[in-house]
Every structure is written in C-alpha cells, then in structure tokens.
Amino acid sequence: MSYTNKRHTYYGGFTNDLSDTFQYPQRTDEQRRKHVTFGPYILGSTLGEGEFGKVKLGWPKNFSNSSNSTFDFPKQVAIKLIKRDSISNDYRKEVKIYREINALKHLSHPNIVKLEEVLQNSRYIGIVLEYACGGEFYKYIQKKRRLKEMNACRLFSQLISGVHYIHSKGLVHRDLKLENLLLDKNENLVITDFGFVNEFCSRNELMKTSCGSPCYAAPELVISAEPYEARKADIWSCGVILYAILAGYLPWDDDPNNPEGSDIGRLYNYINSTPLKFPDYILPIPRDLLRRMLVSDPKKRINLKQIKKHEWLKPHSSFLSITPDEWDKLNNTQSVFRLAKPRRRYGSRPQSSCSTSSLGSRSDKRDSLVIDSTLITFPAPPQESQNHIITRPASIASDQRLSPIRRSNRHNRSNSAASVALQAVVNADREYVLSHEQSLSPVQNIRQTTGNMTASLSPPPAISPGDIIIETTPIKRNTISGSSIVPSLEEESSTTMQTSKIQPNNMASSQNHQYNKNKTQNSLQSAKNFYRTSSSSHTKPRPTSYHPGSYTTPPYNSNTLSIYEINEKAKSSASSQTLNQRDTSPFDSTPYLALDTCITSSSSIESSPKLITHGQFSVAKPSVDLQSVSGDLIKYKRDADVVTRIYDEKYKQKRKSLRYSGIFSDISCDTVTEESDELRPPESPLQQHEGQESIDKAKTEDTSEKGSKSSNIAKATAQKHVNNHLERSLNEAESTKKRFSFLSLYSYDTSKSSLYSSMDSKRKPSPPSQRRPKKDDSYQTNSKNHYITASNMQTSHQVSKDLPAPTMVQNKCTLETKKAVRSNRSSIMVSEVNKASVDNKAAQSPEHSTAKRVLGFFKRRSMKI
C-alpha cells in the first residue's frame, strides 16, 4: 500500500506539489524599490530632529545575509539630512554645516561621534555618522532619575577627555548639553552636534558670538557683550552637565519668580546673585569640583588640567592621562590594522559607490556626489624625469613631456641616443676624477659667442628664439636649456658656463649618435690636461631650482667671463666650434648633450683653445660628430665692424687629407661635401696684404714679449710637423681605397661645412644622391646668410702630438701670459664676412699649388661614389 505525503502549508491547507513546500514569496525589484533610500543607504525611522532637518537611521540597501550566522546584520548609521533649499538663502547656516563637517574630519576620539562620509544630491546633504544605539544621554538620566556617583564619575571623565581633545585641536564646541550627548551600546559617552564649533587662536581665543542653550551657556555669553574665552565657556557647560548627572535636575532652577526658566535675563541675574545649592545626596568631593567649575567669573573658573587632577576623578586618572597625540596615534594604528585585515562584506560601515573606498553599491547608479571624510587631497609634486638629460623647453607641460605617447609636433628622442648620453655622463665624471689626480694647473678657457645670428629658416617647434643654452664643464654638470636644469653630478665643484643664443631654425631628427669605445682610451689623455674654472663673480644657477623662463643670460662683461684665449701655435692648427644652423642639421633639433669623440691621444691643451675631451657634454656644441665638420677661426675685435678670418691653408690641406684618407672608417660619421678652391673668388694682392696686416695686428695684441718668442718657435715647429703629416697622409691615401659610411647619403644636410660668403649662391649644387629628403616645407636657402662651422677638432690634437715637450711647455707659459694681458675678445657668428679677409693665409703658404692638386684628387675620388 502506497503512502502519499501531504505537507501542510503555512496557511493551513495541504498540497501534493512539493515545489511549493516551505517556499516564501520572493520580493520583486518593484517591491525592493519601495524603500526610501539615500545613496547606498536605506532610510529607516527618525532618530531625532534638529535645526536643519531630521536624523534618520540607515543601513545598506543591498544587504544579504551571506554568512552562516543568524544575527549578522549590517552596521547601522545615523544620517543627518539637510535640505539644500533651507541653507541656500542663509549663508550662516551653510557655514555652520561645513564647519561641523570639517571639524569632524579632524577629530578622532572614542568619545566623539565618528564621521563616516558625506553625501549630497540635488535636494539633500547627508552627513553620515556612526549610530549610537544607546540613545540620548538626557533620556537616560530621566529614566534613571540620577546616576550613582561611580557611574557618574566614569561618564564625566569621558566627557572631560573628549572636550580636552577638542580643545587640543584648536576647536571649541560651544553647545555642550545633555541633548548633544549620546550613549553607545556599551553605555559610553559620545559627544555630537558640532553645529556651533569654532576655531580659536592660542594668542587670542576670545569670541563674540553668543551661542548655546539656556541654562548650559556661561553667564559671560548672556550678560556681557564683550568677547569671551570660549574654552572657559565649555567648562561651565560641563559643570552644568555634571550637576544634572548627580542631582537629576539643572542648577538654579529654584527661582520662584522664574520657575520654568523661560526668562533668560532673569535666570542669569539669579545665577550671578545666588550661590550654588546642592542636594543632600551629593558628597563633598564632587561638590568641591562643582563649586570650582560653576563660577560666574571666567578668570576664577577652573581649567581642564586642574579638573583632570581633581581628587574626585582619581579612579580614572589613567584614562585621563592619555594625551591627544596618543589618541591620534592609536586611531592611526587601528586604521592600519583595520585596512590590513580582511573584512566581511557588511562588517563595517557601508561605503558610497562614488567614494574611492566604496564597497556597498559599486554597480548602482545614483545622482549623488560623495564627499568622503577620509579623503584629504594633496597637490601632486612636480614630476621630474631622471631619464632625460635635457628636457623640453618650458612651454611644454611636464605631463606632456613625460607622456609615453609620441606627438607629431614633438621631438622624438631615440632610446640609443639617451643611453649613450647617460653612459657618457658617467664616463665624463670618471675622466674628471682621473684628470684631477694629475694636479696640473688649470687653464681657464671660456669661449663666449655673441653678436648677430641671422637665420633663413622657420623656427622649429622645439626651440624658441629666446632659448638660452648654457654649457658647463664636467667639473659641475649643470646644463640649462630654456628652463630645464640637469641635476649636477658634483655639487661642490665650480662651474664654467658658455652661453649662446639659439636662433629659429627648422627642426629635424637627431642623426646617429655613435659612441665608439675605442676612442675612449685615446681621449683620456686629453681630458687630463683640460680644465675650466668659473669666475668668482659669476652667479651659478641653483641645481635644484626650476622655474620656466626664470633664467636669463647675464650681459657680456669682460670682468665676469674670462676671455677666449689663443696662442700663436693654435692659429696654425686650432679648430673652432660651430653652430651650423642649416636645414635638417642635427643641431636644429631639440637641444641635447652631444658626444664629442676625439680620436687622437694628444695631451696638449695648447694645441687647441677649444679642446673638448671625450665624454664632455654641452648643448652649445653641435650634435654631429666633430670629425665631419670644418671651418675657420674667426677673430673679432670688440669695437670694430669688420670681422677678420684667419685662414690657414696648411691646416685646410691637412684637414681634408685626414678626412678623405679613411682615418674615420671606424667611426659612423657622415661624409663631408666641401667646396673646392676653384669655386672661391681669386685673391688680389691687396686682399692678401690686408689679411696679413690683420694677423700681425692680432699677434701684437695677443702676446707679450715673453710669449712672442715661444709662439714663433711653436709656429715654426707646427708648420714643420704639419708638412710631414701631410706627406704621410697623401701616401696613405694613395694606397688605400675610398672608405665611406652608409650615412654619407645624409652628408649634404648633416655635415655641410665651410664659410659661406655672398658668392655661395653661385656655387654648384651637390649631387642629388647626397641630398636628404626635407621634412619641412619651409626650407629655403638664403645666399646672404653665412654660417661659421666647426673645424675638425682632432687636427689640433694631431699637431700637438708631434710637438716636442719643450715647445709645449713654452706654449703653456705663453698662454698664461696672454691670459693676464688680453682684453675683450670673443668668437662670434656673423651674417657677413669681409671679402678682403678671405684666405689671407694663402699668400704665406708655399704649397698653394700642392693643396689644389690634393683637393682636386680627393674631390674626384669622392664624386665616383
């Protein structure tokens, strides 16, 4: 016999459908939405009403009991709702609200209500506070009638501890009363309602606003209109609260003429004229404390420190001994541990979905703005890129400069160039340490470039016409380009700065910064003898300060910057630095620190007045390999309008022979296309004579009697060794095939050299195969513009290598003598050069025809490629 189970339902009937057994109806979304919500909270019953609105009980609206515990409930909060319309027309009310919010954000004490967060939407501002489930302290006393002394002492000690913490933060409550005191679930006192909170200064803590509730406010607030001491007013309120706790009623309520206390004026007159009375059940010790606290004269009223030390509060002296700083540390420690512990989903206060720490309703959409009390915003510090040696000019913001996204209008720096530059900075520092050990006398060589510079090209986006570039020596690595500062490698060392102003030019990508390790050992010899020291009167830029456009180049002063010096031997073999600002030149790009490779192992500083060792960096130097450029030395007299160029035919021959003989086959540099002598205008005897006179005049100004002898010997010796070196170079060139780099296709733009005169417009153009595609349509040549380019720097090293030791010593003495005699002198870039001074050294050269043959020979060889 089969048996059928008949299960009874909750309404008393029965059914055979087992799917309906013990199934409670599920709430739909529409039923869930019937609850009144504010942000992520469901609003419950009204806890109380205040000046600005109601206080509602709240809890998370997406609560679900996921744990096994039956009594796991979300944390309840008290939400103080304030209508925005009620405060929009009264700025005083709005000030009170935000005062309360800001005060609670800075207060963290167990006896002060905790601010959870602040929410607001289009209608309400909601201040979310912790819920004190014990209720109002006033009702608690009414229920108990009065408290026993032991319990009263415990609660009063908590009140004093909280008030002392508030005062330690520079705040005063000014509205302490029983109605503003709450109890938590453990019957601990909680201070709330900071609507009248205000700040005070330790020097002047007097306040003028009369606030507070009747019977709790100090007499000085009501009777007198003078400023009052706010902390003493809070002490009076605490005394009234203590009296109500012990007696069960308020003091001075026995006036027969004002039994209800409705007449405030009469009440305070009665307070000032009547001594305090106590019921019989209040013991003498608490009476003594009350008599000291409830004194009409605030100057005679006891302070908080004396209250904490009173005999009646000794049982809680350990609690009262906790300082405000210790409360802060304790709260911070608890916060750290609370964040580190894995919290249950609803074990703590619900979070707003708009808050950064939100957990409660991240998926919910609501029209509210969250002001989290725990979020204190601080401005982010300026970010500094430590991976770039030279940053962008100040017109570009730091976030754009550090952005990983490449923009079309920005200079693209290759990673290899940055790596080479960073590595070379370390090498330069190492070389300086090695050179410093040699204890040689430093030679002061600073070259200042001034004058007019004319550019025919459009300004690049990376360099503005007002950008100032300052070159520093490896003694102190401070390089400023526009407004960017490179941190110094050695802060204690002196600084030598070389200034030059960049003119608008077309920008192009930087070309091939090749760093050859084989050249490092050779250049160490040069670095040991090269020093630059700064003038004591020159102001050094601060290495840690950075402000866009704040640095300007000081005007030229011969007393401030040391004069560019040159001796007689250097005139025959010296090389000059260039700023060859032509289209698609590597220097036209954003300034960066270019690597100077010197392949020779010469150690004589006298061989070149602008000798630059390996590993040195400067934004004032061209960013192309210096072996692939050439030029002539320009001698400029400060007061003269004519610039004389010292042209050395022997040096030119040697330079070209070195360039085309394949010496640089191990360096990835560009082939140089150089104009031949046939394209130069012929020299007249008058021009040669004028050039010779200008050289003789320069010799007279630059040397003293002792220096002239040594310079003549150096000149003769240099010419002898130059001739020997030319012969060796020619023999080597005839036996060696033409070597070139694949980068020679870019040689027309990246290493175009020599001095351009007004005859350059008639010059034959280079072959099209040597031209580089132009990136800018604004490229236009101007035949009236002239460029002074740097000569090959290794030539001076080669000459000085062959000089005997006595000659080098004499030249060094000559250089020091000239240093004391020389006056204003500098090397400049000019827009026009006097034709009469071109090739003035050709008349002195006995090998003029040989130079032409050599030049023609290598010219033909280069055209075969």
Swiss-Prot record:
Phosphoserine PTM sites in chain numbering: 441
UniProt-annotated catalytic positions: 175
Primary localisation category: cytoplasm
Comp. bias intervals (Polar residues): 494-538
Biased composition (Basic and acidic residues): 690-708, 724-733
InterPro entries with a match to the protein in the record: Kinase-like_dom_sf, Prot_kinase_dom, Protein_kinase_ATP_BS, Ser/Thr_kinase_AS
Biased composition annotated in UniProt, kind: Low complexity: 352-361
Leading EC class: transferase
Domain called Protein kinase: residue spans: 41-313
Record keyword Transferase present: yes
Subcellular location: Cytoplasm
SUPFAM superfamilies: Protein kinase-like (PK-like) (SSF56112)
Methyltransferase is among the record's keywords: no
Keyword terms: ATP-binding, Cytoplasm, Kinase, Nucleotide-binding, Phosphoprotein, Serine/threonine-protein kinase, Transferase
Miscellaneous comment: Present with 556 molecules/cell in log phase SD medium.
Complexes and interactors: Interacts with FAA3, POL5 and TPA1.
Family classification: Belongs to the protein kinase superfamily. Ser/Thr protein kinase family.
Protein name (record): Fatty acyl-CoA synthetase and RNA processing-associated kinase 1
Origin organism lineage: Eukaryota, Fungi, Dikarya, Ascomycota, Saccharomycotina
Primary gene name: FRK1
